[in-house]
Amino acid sequence: MAEKPKKPQKLRARLPRGLADRGPAEIAATRAMVEKIREVYERYGFEPVETPAFEYTDALGKFLPDQDRPNEGVFSLQDDDEQWISLRYDLTAPLARYVAENFDQLPKPYRSYRFGWVFRNEKPGPGRFRQFMQFDADTVGSGSPAADAEMCMMAADTMEALGIPRGSYLVKLNNRKILDGVLEAIGIGGDEHIKQRLVVLRAIDKLDRLGLQGVEQLLGEGRKDESGDFTRGASLNAGQIRDVITLLNFAGWGDIVDGSNTHTLDEWEGLRFSVNSTFSAGIQDLRQITKITEASGYDTGRIRVDNTVVRGLEYYTGPVFEVELLLDTKDEKGRPVRFGSVGGGGRYDGLVSRFRGEPVPATGFSIGVSRLQAALTLIGQLGNKPQAGPVVVTVFGGEIAGYQKMVATLRKAGIRAELYLGNPKHSLGQQMKYADKRNSPCAIIQGSDEKQQGIVQIKDLILGAELASLEKDRDEYLKKQAEAQFSCKEDEMVAKVQELLQRRGVAWG
């Protein structure tokens, strides 16, 4: 007896780890947020540019963890010409390639902004995704401290444009030269210690997440996390670890009455590391930057020097900065959430120079759009309600052309509208359920009787949803029920829909 053919197995629909789907409400919120950021960046004179998601791997450089495989830390593949290409892990390295390739045609300094998705081939976890959105601005071709100061000021202005009040954010400023000076002083300067220094910097960069004890472990032999995974440390000796921790413990703010950046920098110069020329040069850079920001009206409540700011990427060469949210809020389950850093950047004078073989100074700032959006949504600065859907024109019978004409008329008037394209035999109730799921403000109804009379029925779906709460108040219920559906002549349809949308505060962004 012949075997029955096996039924083909259904493919399992599943989302890859570390990635997320996004619906209309979240996309609309992103659009609103990006527009506010764009307005600030353009006010500062930056212009847009786009680069592709893929770059040659060697163009991106090994600025994420240096591993044996070229696709460690980034998503990479070999092209048909056997060259490695990778998905960008940030928006800065691709910009460096773009500027180098178009150097002679671009104005210098070159001021640009761009936003888009970036990708990290890292272990995903709560709040850590493999794909996320960034919004960057960069000035290439200027080594002036004013360019770095401008990034800090623009970061502060952007936070306020997004509805985050002063006192609820802080732009923190440091200098890689200060950290490099400390590392030189403890004996790990020079090219032969590049990898070890990078491990130290990345350990310090995790201070807000792991605390001093976790950083100490990463400065030493290493640290095992809650899942049991072991991260190899920098292998510093006890004395070297003590010196690094001394710097991190020295905030310089505890006994300062006026909260002065100048006073803090004076205190830093009192540390024994100040005899190091690199350390001293870093202090002088910060003095110039803070002089500019303070003269422009940005006090220490908005921009403040902080020696714990590192930035984890290797390519930074000078001033570095981060934007921290000082908001304590709760997630949807009532658990406390502290968002910390939502953006940062710094000076990267060597990134474009790799392609040019000549010095090309550059500085930039990046906002983590995905992370900041989550924070703004939780504090109520970004709506998470779905945007109003289109006006739905319902259908009766097989004649579609007349209904489609109504849709076209609404669209020509600038009203979002769609024809119900489900089963034409569906009842009016089924079509209304569809309109509700689409979050439609109203629906247009025209059966055979209405068609003969040259009228349409307009059903106010927003008011209809409110009627459910009025069932106990019969008089009010009957009054609003009469308002929830009304008729008008066909040639009055557009005007009546516009009145309803205005009355209900419906505006499509």
Swiss-Prot record:
The keyword Nucleotide-binding appears for this protein: yes
GO terms under cellular component: cytoplasm
Cellular location(s): Cytoplasm
Domain of life: Bacteria
Listed GO MF terms: ATP binding; histidine-tRNA ligase activity
EC number: 6.1.1.21
Record key words, sorted: Aminoacyl-tRNA synthetase, ATP-binding, Cytoplasm, Ligase, Nucleotide-binding, Protein biosynthesis
Primary enzyme class: ligase
Catalytic activity: tRNA(His) + L-histidine + ATP = L-histidyl-tRNA(His) + AMP + diphosphate + H(+)
A single BP term in Gene Ontology: histidyl-tRNA aminoacylation
PROSITE patterns per the UniProt record, alphabetical: AA_TRNA_LIGASE_II
InterPro entries referenced in this protein's UniProt entry, alphabetically: aa-tRNA-synth_II, aa-tRNA-synth_II/BPL/LPL, Anticodon-bd, Anticodon-bd_dom_sf, His-tRNA-ligase, HisRS-like_core, HisRS/HisZ
Presence of keyword Protein biosynthesis: yes
Family: Belongs to the class-II aminoacyl-tRNA synthetase family.
UniProt xrefs under PANTHER family: HISTIDINE--TRNA LIGASE, HISTIDYL-TRNA SYNTHETASE
Subunit and partners: Homodimer.
NCBIfam families per the UniProt record, alphabetical: hisS
The protein, known as: Histidine--tRNA ligase
Upper classification of the organism: Bacteria, Pseudomonadati, Pseudomonadota, Alphaproteobacteria, Hyphomicrobiales
